[in-house]
């Protein structure tokens, strides 16, 4: 059996960089990790509550957290940041929500929103799109093909999508996948973006995995 390594961890230091940039003493490290998770959960919950119901996609590609002694800087990379862009009240509300989670008085919090030019070239946004389709009982093949069409508009070199679970409500769980273009997982210099996403449907949980090949360094 082939041993499948996480494509992001495999490429750290070459084509991938860390999403959390900070140092901590070994005894404080676990606290820092929990802090990061709280920040990310808080942002995702806020976006979920405030986004327009029609779009169905949160549009968060990734969240980068940089910490200094006196400052926590959070950069949110979004595909569709309409309700936060040009809305200082929204960002202030989000900031106060995050600060409620922490009791550190001496650290200032700074939130920045960065818009992504081609949102459907990001696996997280694509996985949310597929999840929305599956929840609306669209057939999985149709959802996969539509997702591939969207990535082709984003100038990607290749994509692989895998869905596992009780697909279309069948009794027996199975794995279905589709690949378009090249996805060289063993080439370290290949820029590959990956995400795994769980979607809860009325039949049970489905796992979606997406690999996107953006080119070689």
UniProtKB/Swiss-Prot annotation:
SUPFAM superfamilies: Prokaryotic type KH domain (KH-domain type II) (SSF54814), Ribosomal protein S3 C-terminal domain (SSF54821). The keyword RNA-binding applies. It is found in: Plastid, Chloroplast. Its main location: plastid. Keywords: Chloroplast, Plastid, Ribonucleoprotein, Ribosomal protein, RNA-binding, rRNA-binding. InterPro entries: KH_dom-like_a/b, KH_sf_prok-type, Ribosomal_S3_C_sf, Ribosomal_uS3_bac-typ, Ribosomal_uS3_C, Ribosomal_uS3_CS. Pfam families: Ribosomal_S3_C. One of its GO terms (biological process) is translation. Gene3D superfamilies: 3.30.300.20, Ribosomal protein S3, C-terminal domain. CDD domains: KH-II_30S_S3. The keyword Plastid applies. One of its GO terms (cellular component) is chloroplast. Residues 43-117 form the KH type-2 domain. Signal peptide: none annotated. One of its GO terms (molecular function) is rRNA binding. Belongs to the universal ribosomal protein uS3 family. Part of the 30S ribosomal subunit. This is Small ribosomal subunit protein uS3c. It comes from Ranunculus macranthus (Large buttercup).
């Amino acid at each position: 059996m082939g041993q499948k390594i996480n494509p992001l961890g495999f490429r750290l230091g070459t084509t991938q960089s860390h999403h959390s940039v900070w140092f901590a003493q070994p005894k404080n490290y676990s606290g820092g990790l929990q802090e990061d998770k709280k920040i990310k959960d808080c942002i995702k919950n806020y976006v979920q509550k405030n986004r327009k119901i029609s779009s169905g996609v949160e549009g968060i590609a990734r969240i980068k957290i940089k910490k200094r002694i006196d400052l926590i800087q959070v950069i949110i990379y979004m595909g569709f940041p309409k309700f936060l862009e040009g809305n200082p009240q929204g960002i202030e509300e989000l900031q106060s929500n995050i600060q409620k989670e922490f009791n550190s008085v001496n650290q200032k919090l700074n939130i920045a929103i960065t818009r992504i030019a081609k949102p459907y070239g990001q696996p997280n946004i694509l996985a949310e799109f597929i999840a929305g389709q599956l929840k609306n009982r669209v057939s999985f093949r149709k959802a996969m093909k539509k997702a591939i069409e969207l990535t082709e508009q984003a100038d990607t070199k290749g994509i692989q999508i895998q869905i596992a679970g009780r697909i279309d409500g069948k009794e027996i769980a199975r794995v279905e996948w589709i690949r378009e273009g090249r996805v060289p997982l063993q080439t370290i210099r290949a820029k590959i973006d990956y995400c795994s996403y769980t979607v809860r449907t009325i039949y049970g949980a489905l796992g979606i995995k997406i690999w996107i090949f953006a080119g070689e360094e």
